[in-house]
């Protein structure tokens, strides 16, 4: 998600 926060794209 967005720049890849929390290890999720």
Curated annotation (Swiss-Prot):
GO cellular component, one term: cytoplasm
Keyword entries, A-Z: Cytoplasm, Glycosyltransferase, Transferase
pH dependence: Optimum pH is 5.5.
EC number(s) per entry: 2.4.1.5
Entry's Gene Ontology molecular function annotations: dextransucrase activity
The keyword DNA repair is assigned to this record: no
Major subcellular location class: cytoplasm
Subcellular location as annotated: Cytoplasm
Catalytic activity field: [(1->6)-alpha-D-glucosyl](n) + sucrose = [(1->6)-alpha-D-glucosyl](n+1) + D-fructose
Top-level division of the source organism's lineage: Bacteria
Thermal dependence of function as given in the entry: Optimum temperature is 35 degrees Celsius.
Induction statement: By sucrose.
Signal peptide (from-to): none
Function: Involved in the production of dextran, an extracellular glucan polymer.
UniProt record similarity statement: Belongs to the glycosyl hydrolase 70 family.
The name this protein goes by in its record: Dextransucrase
Originating species: Leuconostoc mesenteroides
Lineage: Bacteria, Bacillati, Bacillota, Bacilli, Lactobacillales
């Amino acid at each position: 998600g967005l720049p890849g926060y929390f290890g999720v794209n």
